Each structure stands twice: as C-alpha cells, then as structure tokens.
Amino acid sequence: MNMRWQLKYFRALAALLVAASEALAQEMRPVARRIVVSIPDRKLALVEDGRAVKIYPVAVGAAHTPSPAGSFTVIVRVAHPTWYGPGKVVPPGKSNPLGPRWIGLSRKGYGIHGTSNPRSIGRPASHGCIRMHNADVEELFARVAIGDAVEFYAERTDEVARVFGM
C-alpha cells in the first residue's frame, strides 16, 4: 500500500467516524420536553423541542377548587393508582376517579390523571387536578418522565397562544 492511498483511506475513515459520532450524539440528545396546560382553554399540550406535538382536551379545577397556576415538575408516575378520598379508598379499576394513570406533580396533592367520568372533560370539574380521557393519559404517561417541567397557565398569555396555535 502506498503512503498516499493510506492517507486518503485514513481521512475517509476519520470523516466517516466523525459523521457517525455526530449522528449518534444527535440521536442520544435528550428531548427538551414539558407539559403546558391552559386552564381557561381546558387544554394540555405535550411540548417537545419547543413545539406542541400533541394537544389534549382536559377538565380543570372547578370554581371552588381551582387548578393552581404555576410551574411544577413531574415527581411520580403511577400505573393503576389507588384513590384515597375522605373516608374512602378506591382500588384500581373502572370506578377509580384517577383512571388508569397518575402523573404526580411537585405541588402536593396535584397531578394529571385519567377519570371515571369522561363527560367531565372540557369542563371546570375537578378538585384542582387535570383530568384527561383515559386513553389520552395513557399516551401522555408513556411519553413523560420524572423531572419533566409542567406549567399551568391561568390566563391566555403569548406563550399559551404560541403553544396552542391561537
């Protein structure tokens, strides 16, 4: 093998390795993911890398038990949760008010969950949590992780308009 051919081979191999490592780094890059809830619009958006990839209808807190505005973090994810209410415990199943999934937030007692009352979706009907159709919360649950940011907006801000395309 002559020296000139070896040098060309080495350069080609180096370029290939650089391209492959850049592609791998891009693939391994964590997705910047957050959940945005517009309380007045009763909608939840899953935002990845700055754009809404999915928008869901939700139920929000009723007038006497409003959903809190603010920034939170996902701190727990529970499949088939048990509901502990005043003097009552409801195991996982169709009559469980939390539905099939619970995404617990850093604000104690608040979360995003399914429902045993799908007719409440789109209304101010909860005790402050965000209720979703059961199939929707299962889909969201599969895509979010502990540590993801969650933002509840009580007003239609520029950010809400951007996320929800208003």
Where do the PLM segments sit?
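Intrinsically disordered, low-complexity regions enriched in small/polar residues
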Residues: 11, 41, 58, 74, ...
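Short amphipathic alpha-helical segments, especially helix-boundary/capping motifs
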Residues: 20, 48, 75-77, 111-116
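Hydrophobic h-region of N-terminal signal peptides that target proteins for export
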Residues: 15-25
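Exported/periplasmic cell-wall-interacting domains
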Residues: 2, 26-32, 66-69, 81-82, ...
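Bacterial N-terminal signal peptides that target proteins for export
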Residues: 2-13
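Cell wall/extracellular polymer interaction/catalysis modules
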Residues: 24-71, 76, 92, 100-103
